[in-house]
Amino acid sequence: MFTKKLILAASLSVILASQAANAVIGPIKISLNNEYRTSTPVIGAIATSIKLDKSDIKKTGATTFVNLLEKIPSISFEGGPGNLAAVRIRGSESKHTLLLIDGQKVTITGGQPNFKMIPLNQISRIEILKGPFSSLYGPGAIGGVINVFTDKDTNSITSSSIDSSYGSNGTKQSSFNTYYKNDASYLDFTFTDFITDGIDATHKTTGGDDDLDPSDRQTFGLNMGGDIGENTSVSLNMIDSRANIMYDNPDPAGKYENDLRQIGLGVTQKFSDRFETRVDINDQNILRHGSKYELNTISIVNELGFDSSKLSVGLMNSADKDVGNNREIKHTDVFTQWQGLIIDNEVSIGARIIDYDKFSTHTTYNFNWARDLSSTLRVNGSYGTASHLPNHYEQNLNIVADQTTLKPEKSTNLEIGLSGDYDWGNTEFKIYKSKLKDAFKYFSASPAYYKNDGIVNIRGAELSIGTDFLGWDIDTSIDYNKAIAASTGLQKGRRPNRSISLNLSKTSGKWKRNINWIAKSRSWDQDSNTNGWGQTAAELGGYGLLNLSTRYDFTEDLSIYLNRNNALDKNYEMATGYKTPGKTTTLGLTYNF
């Protein structure tokens, strides 16, 4: 099936190319702005975001995507080798984080996005948007959006590279990348092989089996495209990732598959200097522990530009299928966003109407505003709503229990902030609050099911400062967050309410050094601060991790690097009964040609 769809997509590209074979070939490759979902925004950034390019990712010393996420201070992270990874942005649930690959949603399995499907070496850049973005990206984006890009940026030059490394716990990684472009087209191909012996992730007293939990993954990615006419461009993005991840006691037994295959075709047609249309068709297949899922989406976005504003109007259809159970989650959305300048005020307004096949239509919206108070100081604010639909796990339980009245979770969000850019560096301060209504709650009846029951109030503040001192680039951030369940008045489980990060980097001749320290406060393991039997739940202690990395460039094309994660060998837990890696070392070599 996947091969047939690939042939169809390639055939469509050929047909479009043949229709414009005599046209003038122009510039190619457009990268979308993540916040406004357009390649040509007319206003500056308003949303709180974290952006990491390839060099930033290398500086962290991370060996896997989940290892990278663990180093980001404003994210509550749990998981590691041998167990599922959960990512919470600003105190929200893990299922409220929308994961995108090249702009396309990754379907939720096991109650949350599967971050282990994405190999780190395939990633060109990452953009993390904090806050509600359902109006722009659809249901699920309550806490934020993590957009992973596998394609090169527009400034890349024709080149090839090989990267190979070996590290603790028998971890071996090799990757090959080649990128070619000319005035008419581009092609980017990457292959990665990753294998590790892992660690014994769970204690025997909590269901573990006293053995290592190894994993292996082979991935290839292909990005190609170009202008096939003066006003028409096409792109084809593919990623095929196949893995076995040896979780303790998988269900069903002996099923360790963790595969992702995604293909996306995009066509952009420019009708005039002010009006263009983009069509994206995406097919995604996931195999996880013997269960098969398929996500098909098609979106059409029309952009109409004016002198100081832009209007986007789009339509999206999504069919998320649980193949084994012959069930699907379908919704059709109409969305719009206007952005522009109003008397020195930068404003964006958006809305999305979501028609979900299991219940009535609902609407989400957003209003964002910013203004430059001076040449160095900027103020911004936003207000909006977001929603989350039941995922396959929740929906299947309710169908079996004949409970079909589950409504979407909805949140209302407010944020205000100041940012400054000075000769000595930059700073940003944000405060925010969010109210989640109709939260899904699990009821252990026979059969079990979910119902709408509860409100969660979230409040927080974030401060970041960047400067340089004695040749060191210094970035620090402090985050405070409280996610309180209204029914209990208690902090939600596994959500440290304080975190701090300090990052120092320096280049001296051929040497590049990076020091990262991140600390998180204590938290409870359970939402109710009890373990379900009326006993006090385990308290997860606070911890601090020191991560070191250094790189030496023998030539412009040959480099060697050494990473030391958790250099002080800190013993800590992110979830009761689950172990985390101790001190690890990775030695690697990169060659460009």
Regions found by a protein language model. Give the residues of each.
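Short, acidic, small-residue-rich periplasmic hinge/interaction motif at the N-terminus
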Residues: A21-K58
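Periplasmic-side early beta-strands and strand-to-turn transitions of outer-membrane beta-barrels
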Residues: N147, T154-I157, D163-S165, N177-N258
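Gram-negative outer-membrane beta-barrel transporters
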Residues: S308, L341-E346, Y432-K435, N452-S528, ...
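Outer-membrane beta-barrel signature, preferentially recognizing the C-terminal barrel domain
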Residues: T97, P252-I263, V267-K270, K292-E294, ...
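Non-catalytic regulatory/gating segments with a bias toward low-complexity or hydrophobic composition
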Residues: L69, I126-I128, I146-V148
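Short acidic/polar hinge/loop motifs at secondary-structure boundaries
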Residues: Q104-P132
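Extracytoplasmic beta-strand/coil segments of soluble accessory domains associated
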Residues: V66-Q104
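Face-selective signature of the C-terminal outer-membrane beta-barrel domain
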Residues: G225-A243, E257-L373, R378, G420, ...
